[in-house]
Amino acid sequence: MDRRGIIAYLLILQTLLLSTILHAPWSNPSLYADILGAYWRDFAAAGRIPYLHREPSGEPFEYPYLAAGISLLCSSFGGGLTGFYIAYSLTVMAFGVLLAYCALKFKNGPLTLICLAAPSLIVYGIYGYDVIMAALTALAILLYIGRRYTLSGIVLALSAHVKFYSVIFLPYALIDLKGRDRLRFLAAFAITYLAPVAALPSAFIDLVKFHSSWGIEAAWYIFLFPDAAHPVMRLRDVPPEMMASIRAAQVFGYAIFILLYLHVLGLKTSPEKFMALSLMAYFMGTPRYSPQSNILFLPFLASVMDVRAAPFFILWEAANASVIMTWFASSAPHLPWQPPQIAALIRFIGLAAMFVQAEAMLGAIRIRIPKKVRKGIDVFGRVIGRIVGRL
């Protein structure tokens, strides 16, 4: 193992350890975590089992099958709240090491280290299941690059059973693969994905209903559709007179995603670069941009970055961490011009700038930047390059 590899593993373990401390139930104050709220409080502590029971409000467990399975295993090994939290944190750290391993395989450079030290890993690393999903998705892409298509399809399906986002890779594989390779990949994905769905179909239906009933969450274009802002983001709780504005905002967002995604799909690029760009396309348009979702980018992002992207990465990450940091301190965090929504808008600006920079780096577009602005970016990039280049 080279020096940079050692630093990468130490970085991600350090960030996840800090996240463990921030979200720990014994910390005061303690940041909210979904594993302690959506799972432990609503299910494990009350003797309920995801999919077999519902939380007190009548809602189902909101995460797919593998997320529930990992939670059940951790609570079985851990016993009480403290034991569960320690077991879960150690599990996330193990997947964090896998995430770092895959990220280094995609691009072993100083920018990878910057990604592995992202504030999102500190603020949201132990929040939910995002590190696990990102690590499994990265492993599936790494196996795909190594032409191990059956294993890749299996692991991609497992990642989709933690969170759905990884299915964004399927169209790329359908276009890229031919003949038996395509058949092996799709069969492996379909069998692995559909097996638990066939075993517990009602749970899958509940999951689809739950996530399709969501409104607008931290989407930058709430400034364009202020009438779509509502403190409760579930559509069933929204007054009928607001539905037209919410639907218009959703159509606007998904139209942005589809146009950008089709553009990315048309580029001739490698699987890890495709994942980085397609995730950017999705989160620039999605009506629901949960701040913990930034973790999904981290294994792939360095593959489409150079040092000139460093200012935009810092802006994007700082704004993303600010969303949750300001959310509970705001009297009406869902409204435009409140601190969380301003942070979401700045986050979009940083992400859009990284997307344009990545497209320019890959030769997909040409951009002209004013000389003074370009000089400032280059100076900042050189400073960052000198700092991380020593690592």
Give names to the regions the model predicted.
Residues M1-V208, I246-L391:
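Multi-pass membrane glycosyltransferase architecture that uses lipid-linked
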